């Protein structure tokens, strides 16, 4: 149910220079989705009446992602006046003029912050009757953060930036997490009063807190249960730390949901992956994107699946698959490479050193080893022997190969596409199929074997091969002489 008294402001205008990247900080992937997508998902879960996202640097790229992840969000461009206070000021101006509820302000770079924590913050704010409530934290190292200084009654007195703090204030372990809930009326009033009269020439949202206290309003601070919930991401090291924490949380959640994860330290699961109970993940498994695995399947070891569907009871080991579908009870690997468009039917097999692309492989069909099958269809219960390939590319265009059901394709057969092989047909070893093969036929390409005597001695004299042939010839001559009694 929509909370008509809640508006959310997502701050996404920062440049993120410490990332040292052409990609905006908030668009770096974390758990398979952009950093800001985590914050937008949390905003959606709160069911606010209004959501406003403030952008500036790389605004078009950010706006595109925001539009996909949270289409209902209003996008506001921050102007030339810098600072978080100015960003919030412009966001509030985009709210309906008669909005009189609460405004939650959250940074776009706190992906681990969950909806439950924000609900607690909003509830505490409403219960306390304060003009503003701040989320605070007790990190292991507080250096560099603004400190929360409380009154004797426990209310927030002021926020002191680290550089301005006394020794006694620096000893305070509680810091400002940079996430706020304001009453809309008080926020509008004080935003109009903040200035850029400071060393950085910026409008700070923290100045609103100071102005509220100076005007006699109460301001509260609510500590989070774990400081990592409000950890921001400013550089690659922090991104890596957040990824590790998020993955640990994700893996544990799936374990509690009935998934066996043999080695959590080497298993990575993106946040939009879906797993059924009784799935088993072996060491070195990476499940990326929107991968979905059904009950009883075993994945790994050393397997990466991206946007891939795995059916119930399937086994996939030492495999790399992207945009593929693996049927129930199918077997894949080891050392298989499934490229986009691969569909393997139930009980099918893609075995060792097999590569497939844009290929539909029927139920019970087998590609056991050393195959390339691209732009092809293989019917049910067909079997492709070792070394079978589809030659699908003529240098300009790709062409399809169609192999019927219950077909037996012998070792080292090459299909020169476009070509079709009917149901129940066979090929002989080494066949090059250039024409369609009727159902129930045997296709063979046989040429007489020609042996050119003495070729190595003439064309490769002095080589190890020539010397070996010479020794063999001498031995054969000696044996022949003995047999003739000479």
From Swiss-Prot:
GO terms for biological process: cell morphogenesis; cell wall organization; lipid A biosynthetic process; peptidoglycan biosynthetic process; regulation of cell shape; UDP-N-acetylglucosamine biosynthetic process. GO terms for molecular function: glucosamine-1-phosphate N-acetyltransferase activity; magnesium ion binding; UDP-N-acetylglucosamine diphosphorylase activity. The keyword Cytoplasm applies. Its EC number is 2.7.7.23, 2.3.1.157. Its main location: cytoplasm. Residues 1-236 are annotated as: Pyrophosphorylase. Keywords: Acyltransferase, Cell shape, Cell wall biogenesis/degradation, Cytoplasm, Magnesium, Metal-binding, Multifunctional enzyme, Nucleotidyltransferase, Peptidoglycan synthesis, Repeat, Transferase. Acetyl-CoA binds at residues 386, 392-393, 429. GO terms for cellular component: cytoplasm; membrane. NCBIfam families: glmU, PRK14352.1. Homotrimer. Catalyzes the last two sequential reactions in the de novo biosynthetic pathway for UDP-N-acetylglucosamine (UDP-GlcNAc). The C-terminal domain catalyzes the transfer of acetyl group from acetyl coenzyme A to glucosamine-1-phosphate (GlcN-1-P) to produce N-acetylglucosamine-1-phosphate (GlcNAc-1-P), which is converted into UDP-GlcNAc by the transfer of uridine 5-monophosphate (from uridine 5-triphosphate), a reaction catalyzed by the N-terminal domain. PANTHER family: BIFUNCTIONAL PROTEIN GLMU (PTHR43584:SF3), NUCLEOTIDYL TRANSFERASE (PTHR43584). This is Bifunctional protein GlmU. It comes from Leifsonia xyli subsp. xyli (strain CTCB07).
């Amino acid at each position: 149910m929509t909370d008509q008294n809640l508006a959310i402001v997502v701050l996404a205008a920062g440049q993120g220079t410490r990332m040292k990247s052409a990609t905006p900080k908030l668009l770096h992937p974390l758990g398979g989705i952009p950093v800001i997508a985590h914050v937008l998902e949390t905003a959606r879960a709160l069911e606010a009446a209004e959501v406003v996202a403030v952008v500036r640097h790389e605004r078009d790229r950010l706006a595109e992602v925001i539009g996909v992840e949270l289409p209902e969000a209003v996008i506001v461009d921050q102007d030339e006046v810098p600072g978080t206070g100015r960003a919030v000021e412009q966001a509030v101006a985009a709210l309906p003029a008669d909005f009189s509820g609460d405004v939650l302000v959250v940074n776009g770079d706190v992906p681990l912050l969950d909806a439950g924590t924000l609900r607690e913050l909003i509830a505490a704010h409403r219960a306390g009757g304060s003009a503003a409530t701040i989320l605070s934290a007790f990190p292991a190292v507080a250096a560099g953060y603004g400190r929360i200084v409380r009154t004797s009654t426990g209310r927030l007195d002021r926020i002191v930036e680290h550089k301005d703090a006394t020794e006694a204030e620096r000893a305070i372990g509680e810091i400002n997490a940079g996430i706020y809930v304001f009453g809309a009326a008080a926020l509008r009033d004080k935003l109009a009063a903040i200035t850029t009269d400071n060393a950085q020439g910026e409008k700070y949202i923290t100045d609103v807190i100071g102005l509220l206290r100076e005007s006699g309003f109460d301001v509260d601070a609510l500590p989070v249960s774990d400081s990592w919930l409000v950890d921001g991401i400013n550089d690659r090291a922090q991104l890596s730390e957040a990824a590790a924490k998020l993955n640990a949380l994700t893996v544990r959640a799936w374990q509690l949901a009935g998934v066996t994860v043999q080695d959590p330290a080497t298993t990575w699961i993106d946040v939009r992956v879906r797993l059924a109970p009784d799935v088993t993940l072996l060491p070195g498994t990476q499940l990326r994107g929107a991968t979905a695995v059904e009950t009883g399947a075993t994945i790994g070891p050393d397997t990466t699946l991206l946007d891939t569907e795995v059916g119930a009871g399937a086994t996939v080991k030492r495999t790399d698959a992207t945009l593929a579908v693996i049927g129930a009870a199918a077997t894949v690997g080891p050392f298989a490479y499934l490229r986009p468009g691969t569909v393997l039917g139930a009980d099918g097999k893609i075995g060792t050193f097999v590569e497939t692309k844009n290929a539909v492989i029927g139920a019970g069909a087998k590609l056991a080893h050393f195959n390339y099958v691209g732009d092809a269809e293989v019917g049910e219960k067909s079997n492709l022997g070792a070394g079978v390939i589809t030659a699908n590319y003529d240098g300009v265009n790709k062409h399809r190969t169609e192999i019927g059901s219950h077909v037996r394709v012998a070792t080292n057969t090459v299909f020169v596409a476009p070509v079709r092989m009917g149901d129940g047909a066979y090929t002989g070893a080494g066949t090059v199929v250039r024409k369609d093969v009727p159902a129930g036929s045997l296709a063979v390409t046989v040429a007489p074997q020609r042996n050119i005597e003495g070729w190595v001695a003439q064309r490769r004299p002095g080589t190890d091969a020539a010397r070996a042939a010479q020794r063999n010839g001498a031995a054969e001559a000696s044996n022949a002489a003995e047999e003739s009694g000479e």
